[in-house]
């Protein structure tokens, strides 16, 4: 018989039969057509690793950080809000600042945020953090999922602006967005080197296969 259990070291993240789950704050409401599970008097949303790189990273063993109910998260590249909605489930008394540059994606994101008071959608360019400096609190986690060649640079700049001294940064490095002609392994090594040379310590890193090809999740913290 299957049971819902909390993932070790991951507050607010649960697992049942190899499926990740988060508690649904709006019972009966789906965000992206995800499955719903009722267990022990609670409703859970299935966190699809093929729709969310963070779910893929956790299933592949990423550890070393945990969000609390009152955590502040800066999400760079929130898109339509799939992953951000699950983070919202976890940080129930916190805040998820969702940076998205595409007006089309922002329209979808706004629909998700309407029923989630802890999500703040911002139509901004993640490569220009000073433009939203006064709108975002200091963050416990800066999460980056953008398909740009300079993704590591903008990730570092946002951490320099917003990351708390004891906070964490998590980037989903997309090798093919940086250079389609070169080995992903070499690209990952170079991007990790950029993070280290900018004063960040690597806490963990995992590939996202089989859910995402040529992607790596890299978790960092200030090297102080």
Swiss-Prot record:
Q: Which UniProt keywords apply?
A: Methyltransferase, RNA-binding, rRNA processing, Transferase, tRNA processing
A GO BP term, please? tRNA processing
Q: What does the entry list as the binding residues for S-adenosyl-L-methionine?
A: 82-83, 100-101, 125-126, 145-148
Q: Name one Pfam family in it.
A: Fibrillarin
What's the top EC group for this one?
A: transferase
Q: Which Gene3D superfamilies match?
A: Phosphorylase Kinase, domain 1, Vaccinia Virus protein VP39
Q: What is its EC number?
A: 2.1.1.-
One example GO MF annotation: histone H2AQ104 methyltransferase activity
Family to which the UniProt record says this protein belongs: Belongs to the methyltransferase superfamily. Fibrillarin family.
Quaternary structure and interacting proteins, as annotated: Interacts with nop5. Component of box C/D small ribonucleoprotein (sRNP) particles that contain rpl7ae, FlpA and nop5, plus a guide RNA.
Function description:
Involved in pre-rRNA and tRNA processing. Utilizes the methyl donor S-adenosyl-L-methionine to catalyze the site-specific 2'-hydroxyl methylation of ribose moieties in rRNA and tRNA. Site specificity is provided by a guide RNA that base pairs with the substrate. Methylation occurs at a characteristic distance from the sequence involved in base pairing with the guide RNA.
What is the protein's name according to its record? Fibrillarin-like rRNA/tRNA 2'-O-methyltransferase
At the highest ranks, the source species' classification is: Archaea, Methanobacteriati, Methanobacteriota, Methanomada group, Methanobacteria
């Amino acid at each position: 018989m299957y049971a819902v259990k909390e993932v070790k070291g991951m507050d607010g993240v649960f697992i049942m039969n190899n499926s990740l789950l988060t508690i649904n704050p709006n019972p009966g409401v789906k965000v992206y057509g995800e499955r719903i599970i009722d267990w022990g008097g609670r409703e859970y949303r299935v966190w699809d690793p093929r729709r969310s790189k963070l779910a893929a990273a956790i299933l592949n063993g990423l550890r070393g950080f945990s969000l609390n109910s009152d955590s502040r998260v800066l999400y760079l590249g929130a898109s339509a809000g799939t992953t951000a909605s699950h983070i919202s489930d976890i940080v129930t008394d916190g805040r998820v600042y969702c940076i998205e540059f595409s007006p089309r994606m922002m329209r979808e994101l706004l629909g998700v945020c309407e029923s989630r008071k802890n999500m703040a959608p911002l139509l901004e360019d993640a490569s220009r953090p000073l433009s939203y400096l006064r709108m975002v609190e200091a963050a416990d986690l800066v999460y980056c999922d953008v398909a740009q060649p300079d993704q590591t640079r903008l990730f570092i700049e946002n951490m320099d602006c917003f990351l708390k001294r004891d906070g964490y940064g998590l980037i989903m490095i997309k090798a093919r967005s940086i250079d389609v002609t070169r080995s992903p392994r070499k690209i990952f090594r170079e991007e990790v080197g950029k993070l280290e040379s900018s004063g960040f310590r690597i806490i963990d890193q995992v590939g996202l296969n089989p859910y995402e090809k040529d992607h790596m999740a890299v978790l960092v913290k200030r090297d102080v």
